[in-house]
């Protein structure tokens, strides 16, 4: 998988997610004209369960929420996500209505579309990522041509943004 600089909109586009999921990434500074290392930008995530490509942000409470499929309802845990997989629940489960999918001996659930080598640490409750600014570290070898070797992502607080604007951009990436 590679990261692509789309040019005029200063967007870095990740590989397409499965139907009904999408990412939108907006740079926090102007994209460089040459390939760069340690390039830092803000990552605005739009990922929710939908029926088709009409991607919307779900805000089910006063918290900033991004839907992550496969997490059992009523699970309250601070859960690291490594290489696209929720690795282990480290706090108690209140009332589990669904089993979390197990990919090994540990409780694991897929978070589709996360790049390999991406590590996310964010609390997950009731099937949603709640914290808006965990660090995501990406370690890639430099990618040739016009791509960017990305070292750090920061999740954005999308409540302070124009969600319609970003949803429109996100849908265009599918």
Swiss-Prot record:
Taxonomic source organism: Caenorhabditis elegans
Taxonomic superkingdom: Eukaryota
Name of the protein this chain belongs to: Uncharacterized protein C28F5.1
